[in-house]
């Protein structure tokens, strides 16, 4: 008989430990583990972590088996793991209706429960009686389901369960924008049931999504139908938000020890090694004690000062928990595992020794890990005075199974029984390893042979869309529809993935669908519902952004491939040459670099072997040959009747998968290019006619299916020109001189409404006026009046032969102004028609997810409305309309700016540093004011000029303002594109002699306002007559420069800088932490009557985002941005006084009073130097001298000089005598 090896003996010891501390509690029926002897409920998160030691021990036995009994032991342990994981699966699958609802609502009431009955798998508390929404719990289950399946365990048994897991993927993929209650189930640390965005949830969701992608849940016994699919763009959304949050944990927690599970085992969710180390150091520095780590600062759980009879805390009560937070040995187990995975033996040894010292010996000397260590009630004051000196006592669960399991797992790995690769078979531990450089492959395709010839003349050789066959080219919208059928299961009433826009990572792959290769064009080319895609420069900008994004975020096997089609809209007016912006972009891509990205252009067929290709197995046909039963009626009567137009109800989400399947079937069956060789025989007579009818039916049906899936430019994707939808024309008169029309944009338009004998508006006469006018602006204004007075569906009877509703006429007019790129009218009509801004709600969510609150409309409240949580599209647009006070153009411009802000947030998040609230109304006002200041024009003219900027010019102007650089605006004297307005050149100060490269992009903005001076149309010098109606195009932003005379270019520089910083809410680095210190030495800060009380420091810590937002809410009561910035400077001076070793600097400090004292000191000194009243004119709104606004912060006459004197004067009774003497 073979003797037992030493390793076998050690494993037997661990097996006894696991049995005595974990498995003895496992329910024999459900496999679930109760939280403790007292708490019989089974928490999802605790169960998953608690079973890891069992899983690890099973792997160790499998690896180190000395005899058959060891193999049997390994199997027994592994089946205990499977039993628990399936028990949790049964708990969740019983709530399948909640999974379905949550995909669309993201509501806390629709979330899966966090805990279940250990014996029955049933729920134990109501939906609203617990903080159930804990995305990290669902995510950690999915993560280890993937890891365990990859290690060889067979947990999922049926395709129904596969579909349920696929829907759990949809459940967690929106974690980056979903506020939940977090790993500690409390949400906001005030414990008042307020959900918030948690880094621990976002990070764990990212890890789970990456682990499950392309994983076969049946393991080696699986097939195409058991594979899980994850969209890469959702993963990258999570990564972006996670990076913006860390090292913070949430809005209310500046650091949290739970982040160890995100930056290290098990998630390994962060790719930036420096951010990983920074986060770990923050935890060690701020949370580590003698017995473990606190969960987060001011955590009251089980402290002597916590009232066990109250569920929630009072906000000011949190200060009582400072320095006496309970310490959890659990987190030292994470440090041990982190040391093992990183190969840091010294760290492993250090924390093992520390952990051994806090373990409690149970019966027979079994080491038990307590839940936490607390300060004894009678020694609280002593701990307050000298933190980390009082000996603490163990409290809570014993053992804490979560911690006990990780302790055993860490010991197994530290002793070499398990290698990192065995517990991490999906290799997540390599997340911080540098990735190879990405080369973006770009395939340029021509829509037609004519465009191909034009490109060839320019030295650019491409294929047409028809020539790339058998590869199919489709718009991104189709891919979104295809994915909407993923995870569908009628028996479980699961609808699949909610329809969402497809990101650039998704469209940069090739797809194998039914043994055919598909490529999808980028989403921004498919944005025909909104006007951004009408601007070729904007298309180039979005392409540049996507290429840069791909280079930094691509993590898949193979290279990304972008299919970039060139359509007729990308040609010049005459259609004989390519737009200069598009041509320049194509040449740069051919050179190998564009937008900082390495690019390789070539044929699509050449990229097949190097591209990332995904097999969409869920679209594969079933046994009958097709995924869905289909019945095409191809007879002539069917075509003649026109019923084919109503075959599919595109509004029904439930049938969306059927529609896509039918569309793809028809596409594959009927759009193959016909051979060019002459046929050997030719049908004649009736046969030939029936064949033609058959082809016509096929193509018409295919076009219809495409249109019902909202595919624009159908002819661009189908190899036929037989059927192109023609928009009905109502023959509104074109302008006889379109260029002159374009050159004279209307700033203020008056419509003289015709009246009948009773004094009512004569609508027939108004329609006749519409028919006779050739002015596009006047046509738009008349249609707006008809829209508001009669409604969009009113039939104007413009022509007797057919209906001509107001909506139809506006749509036709929108097409006309779109062709000539009249951006002011495009925005105006878009606002009237309420055209949907593509991904507006997603843009808003992206900004909010980066902890940026938004406001729309101009201050003060209630006109300025704050957006602090994601809103549905309809609610968001309604809020913007209300804040815009009915001005359609301002409303649509607000939405446009929100989209641009989200673009910059995604590519250049550094632009938004130290900005916690983006005030879009003020940003637009500053844009208009800058135009007014630099062009010496009125506010109304500047507003009209702003409205006439092309989208690309608007986006670049926004970048200048966000970047904080000094820039100038001037009219260009050079003629520009005849289509559009004169150029307004926007450049950085001092960049006159810049190189050609520097003059492009950010350094030189060429926009398209008209080539003549701004002037008004139809503005009579007389007062407005009673029959005159003003249209919303007359709206403008107030400007301080309406009557400003020309002045030296340097004059006004500092006032402009303060206005920009104030509008953007930009503050100095560390400003909020300094305000926190000031509040500790006074009773509060008063700004325009609103008080920021010192009690906030008892609730919030200096580094909390929540505190920063609280300070912002007080400062934002000030409507004038430059005045707000002076108040910020005054508070900065107070922070310097707060550093002095004195107990108090006053009671409630009125900050605006300090500013006015400084203003008086400034005026006195300037008068003694001979300044007259004209030079010392005051701003009527704030009473501050405009010259003080324009003073530099430093220097003898700097604002800080006067503010320092004023602050010392204001608080002098609290200051030491020596300080006062310095005045």
UniProtKB/Swiss-Prot annotation:
> What is any one GO biological process for this UniProt entry?
positive regulation of glycogen catabolic process
Associated clinical condition: Glycogen storage disease 9D: A metabolic disorder characterized by slowly progressive, predominantly distal muscle weakness and atrophy. Clinical features include exercise intolerance with early fatigability, pain, cramps and occasionally myoglobinuria.
Q: Where is the lipid attached (S-farnesyl cysteine)?
A: 1220
**Does ATP-binding appear among the keywords?**
no
* MF-aspect GO terms: calmodulin binding; phosphorylase kinase activity
Gene assigned in the entry? PHKA1
Return the protein name.
Phosphorylase b kinase regulatory subunit alpha, skeletal muscle isoform
Pfam families linked: Glyco_hydro_15, KPBB_C
Q: Where in the cell is it found?
A: Cell membrane
Q: In which pathway does it act?
A: Glycan biosynthesis; glycogen metabolism
Query: Family per UniProt?
Result: Belongs to the phosphorylase b kinase regulatory chain family.
Region feature Disordered, mapped onto this chain: 1021-1056
What taxonomic classification does the UniProt entry list for its organism? Eukaryota, Metazoa, Chordata, Craniata, Vertebrata
Q: For this protein, what post-translational modification is recorded in UniProt?
A: Although the final Cys may be farnesylated, the terminal tripeptide is probably not removed, and the C-terminus is not methylated.
Q: Which InterPro entries match?
A: 6-hairpin_glycosidase_sf (IPR008928), 6hp_glycosidase-like_sf (IPR012341), GH15-like (IPR011613), KPBA/B_C (IPR045583), PHK_A/B_su (IPR008734)
Membrane topology according to the record:
Lipid-anchor
Q: Where is the composition biased (Low complexity)?
A: 1023-1039
* Function (record text): Phosphorylase b kinase catalyzes the phosphorylation of serine in certain substrates, including troponin I. The alpha chain may bind calmodulin.
Instruction: Specify where the region named Calmodulin-binding lies, as residue ranges.
Output: 810-840, 1046-1086
Q: Which residues carry this modification: Phosphoserine?
A: 629, 729, 735, 758, 972, 981, 985, 1007, 1018, 1020, 1023, 1113
């Amino acid at each position: 008989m073979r003797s037992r090896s030493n390793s076998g003996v050690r494993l037997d010891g661990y097996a006894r430990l696991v049995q005595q501390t974990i498995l003895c509690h496992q329910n024999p029926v459900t496999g679930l583990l109760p939280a403790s002897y007292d708490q019989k409920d089974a928490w999802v998160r605790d169960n998953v972590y608690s079973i890891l030691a069992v899983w690890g021990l099973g792997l160790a036995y499998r690896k180190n088996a000395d005899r058959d009994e060891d193999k049997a032991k390994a199997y027994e342990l592994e089946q205990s793991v499977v039993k628990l994981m399936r028990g949790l699966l049964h708990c969740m699958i019983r709530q399948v209706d909640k999974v379905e609802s949550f995909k669309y609502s993201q509501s806390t009431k629709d979330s899966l429960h966090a805990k279940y009955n250990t014996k029955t798998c049933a729920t134990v508390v109501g939906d609203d009686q617990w903080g159930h929404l804990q995305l990290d719990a669902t995510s950690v289950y999915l993560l280890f389901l993937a890891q365990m399946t990859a290690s060889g365990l067979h947990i999922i048994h049926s395709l129904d369960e596969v579909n349920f897991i696929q829907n759990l993927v949809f459940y967690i993929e929106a974690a980056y924008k979903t506020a939940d209650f977090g790993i500690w189930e409390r949400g906001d640390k005030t414990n008042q049931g307020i959900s918030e965005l948690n880094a621990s949830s976002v990070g764990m969701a990212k890890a789970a999504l990456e682990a499950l992608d392309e994983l076969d849940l049946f393991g080696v016994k699986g097939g195409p139908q058991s594979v899980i699919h994850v969209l890469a763009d959702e993963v990258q959304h999570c990564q972006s938000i996670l990076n913006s949050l860390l090292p913070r944990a949430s809005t209310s927690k500046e650091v949290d020890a739970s982040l160890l599970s995100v930056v290290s085992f098990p998630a390994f969710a962060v790719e930036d090694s420096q951010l990983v180390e920074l986060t770990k150091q923050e935890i060690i520095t701020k949370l580590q004690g003698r017995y473990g780590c606190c969960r987060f600062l001011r955590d009251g759980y089980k402290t002597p000062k916590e009232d066990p009879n109250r569920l929630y805390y009072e906000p000011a009560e949190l200060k009582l928990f400072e320095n006496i937070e309970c310490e959890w040995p659990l987190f030292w187990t994470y440090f041990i595992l982190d040391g093992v995975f990183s190969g840091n033996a010294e760290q492993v040894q250090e924390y093992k020794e520390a952990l051994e010292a806090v373990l409690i010996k149970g019966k027979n000397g079994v080491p038990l890990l307590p839940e936490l260590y607390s300060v004894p009630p009678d020694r609280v004051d002593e701990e307050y005075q000298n933190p980390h000196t009082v000996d603490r006592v163990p409290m809570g669960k014993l053992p804490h199974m979560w911690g006990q399991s990780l302790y055993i797992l860490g010991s197994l790995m530290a002793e070499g029984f398990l290698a990192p690769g065995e517990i991490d078979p999906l290799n997540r531990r390599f997340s911080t390893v540098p990735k190879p450089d990405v080369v973006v492959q770009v395939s340029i395709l021509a829509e037609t042979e004519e465009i191909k010839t034009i490109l060839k003349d320019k030295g650019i050789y491409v294929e047409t869309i028809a020539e790339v066959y058998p590869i199919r080219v489709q718009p991104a919208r189709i891919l979104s529809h295809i994915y909407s059928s993923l995870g569908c299961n009628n028996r479980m009433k699961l609808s699949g993935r909610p329809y969402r826009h497809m990101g650039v990572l998704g469209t940069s792959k090739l797809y194998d669908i039914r043994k055919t290769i598909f490529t999808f064009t980028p989403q921004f080319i498919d944005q025909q519902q909104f006007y951004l895609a009408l601007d070729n420069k904007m298309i180039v900008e979005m392409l540049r952004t996507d290429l840069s994004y791909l280079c930094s975020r691509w993590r898949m096997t193979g290279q990304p491939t972008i299919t970039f089609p060139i359509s007729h809209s990308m040609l010049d007016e005459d259609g004989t040459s390519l737009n200069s912006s598009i041509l320049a972009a194509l040449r740069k891509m051919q050179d190998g670099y564009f937008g900082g990205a390495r690019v390789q252009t070539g044929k699509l067929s050449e990229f097949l072997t190097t591209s990332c290709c995904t097999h969409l197995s869920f679209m594969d046909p079933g046994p009958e040959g097709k995924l869905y039963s289909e019945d095409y009626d191809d007879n002539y009567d069917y075509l003649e009747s026109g019923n084919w137009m109503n075959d599919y109800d595109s509004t029904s989400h439930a049938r969306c998968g059927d529609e896509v399947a039918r569309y793809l079937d028809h596409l594959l069956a009927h759009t193959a290019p016909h051979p060019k060789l002459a046929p050997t025989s030719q049908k004649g007579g009736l046969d030939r006619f029936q064949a033609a009818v058959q082809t016509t039916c096929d193509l018409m049906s295919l076009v219809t299916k495409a249109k019902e899936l909202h595919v624009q430019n159908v002819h661009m994707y189908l190899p036929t020109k037989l059927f192109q939808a023609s928009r009905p024309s109502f023959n509104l008169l074109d302008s006889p001189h379109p260029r002159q029309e374009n050159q004279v944009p209307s700033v203020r338009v008056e419509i003289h409404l015709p009246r009948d004998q009773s004094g009512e508006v004569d609508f027939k006469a108004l329609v006749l006026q519409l028919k006779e006018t050739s002015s596009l602006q006047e046509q738009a204004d008349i249609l707006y009046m008809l829209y508001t007075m009669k409604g969009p569906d009113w039939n104007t009877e413009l022509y007797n032969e057919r209906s001509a509703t107001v909506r139809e006429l506006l749509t036709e007019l929108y097409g006309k102004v779109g062709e000539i790129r009249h951006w002011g009218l495009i925005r105006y009509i878009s606002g009237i028609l309420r055209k949907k801004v593509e991904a507006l709600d997603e843009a808003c969510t992206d900004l909010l997810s980066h902890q940026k609150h938004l406001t729309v409309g101009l201050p003060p409240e209630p006109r300025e409305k704050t957006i602090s949580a994601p809103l549905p599209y309809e609610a968001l647009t309604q809020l913007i309309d209300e804040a815009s006070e009915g001005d359609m153009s301002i409303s649509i411009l607000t939405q446009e700016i929100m989209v641009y802000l989200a673009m910059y947030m995604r590519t250049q998040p550094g632009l938004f540093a130290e900005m916690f609230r983006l005030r879009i109304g003020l940003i637009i006002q500053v844009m208009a004011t800058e135009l007014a200041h630099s062009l010496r024009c009125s506010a109304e003219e500047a507003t009209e000029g702003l409205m006439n900027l092309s989208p690309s010019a608007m986006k670049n102007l926004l970048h200048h303002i966000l970047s904080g650089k000094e820039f100038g605006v001037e009219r260009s004297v050079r003629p520009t594109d005849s289509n559009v307005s004169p150029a307004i050149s926007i450049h950085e100060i001092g960049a006159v002699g810049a190189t050609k490269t520097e003059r492009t992009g950010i350094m030189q903005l060429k926009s398209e306002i008209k080539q003549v001076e701004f002037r008004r149309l139809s503005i009579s010098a007389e007062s407005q007559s009673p029959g005159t109606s003003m249209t919303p195009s007359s709206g403008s932003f107030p400007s301080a420069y309406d009557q400003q005379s020309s002045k030296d270019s340097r004059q006004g520089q500092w006032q402009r800088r303060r206005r920009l910083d104030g509008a953007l809410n930009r503050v100095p680095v560390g400003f909020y932490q300094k305000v926190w210190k000031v509040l500790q030495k006074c009773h509060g800060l008063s700004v325009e009557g609103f008080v920021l009380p010192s009690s906030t420091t008892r609730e919030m810590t200096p580094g909390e985002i929540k505190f920063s937002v609280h300070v912002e809410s007080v400062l934002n009561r000030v409507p004038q941005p430059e005045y707000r910035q002076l108040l910020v400077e005054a508070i900065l001076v107070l922070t310097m006084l707060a550093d002095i070793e004195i107990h108090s600097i006053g009671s409630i400090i009125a900050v605006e009073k300090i500013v006015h004292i400084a203003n008086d000191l400034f005026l006195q000194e300037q008068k003694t130097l001979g300044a007259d009243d004209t030079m010392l004119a005051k701003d009527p709104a704030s009473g501050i001298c405009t010259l003080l606004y324009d003073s530099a912060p430093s220097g003898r006459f700097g604002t800080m000089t006067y503010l320092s004197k004023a602050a010392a004067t204001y608080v002098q009774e609290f200051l030491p005598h020596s300080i006062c003497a310095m005045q």
